A protein has these predicted regions:
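Short, charged recognition helix plus adjacent turn
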Residues: 2, 10-11, 62-74
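Short basic helix-loop element that most often maps to the first helix and adjoining turn
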Residues: 6-25
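Residue-level detection of the helix-turn-helix DNA-binding "recognition helix"
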Residues: 13, 27, 38, 66
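Residues in the helix-turn-helix
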Residues: 21, 32, 60
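Recognition helix of helix-turn-helix/homeodomain-like DNA-binding domains
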Residues: 28-42
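Short, basic-rich loop-to-helix N-cap that marks the start of a DNA-contacting helix
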Residues: 39-52
Length: 74
């Protein structure tokens, strides 16, 4: 997947926070955090909650890496 949450994990390390801290601060479920750990999509609402809890923007949480290769049926 081209989108990932690497910037979020860096933010957490810099702030000395754990994933469980973000779950509590943002009111997330453990399933949401598990999805993020697998670089799976989350809802905009959950993204907004994380941004508010960490006082940041989506750019501080998500990065785009253009290494996605699309399968083409030949």
């Amino acid at each position: 997947m081209a989108l990932n949450y690497k910037p979020l994990w860096i933010q957490l390390a810099k702030k000395g926070l754990k994933k469980t801290d973000v779950i509590a601060m943002a009111g997330l479920t453990t399933n949401v955090m598990a999805q993020m750990g697998k670089d799976k999509p989350i809802t905009f609402k959950n993204l907004e909650r994380i941004c508010k809890a960490l006082s940041c923007t989506p750019n501080d949480i998500i990065s785009f890496e253009d290494n996605y290769v699309e399968k083409v049926n030949v």
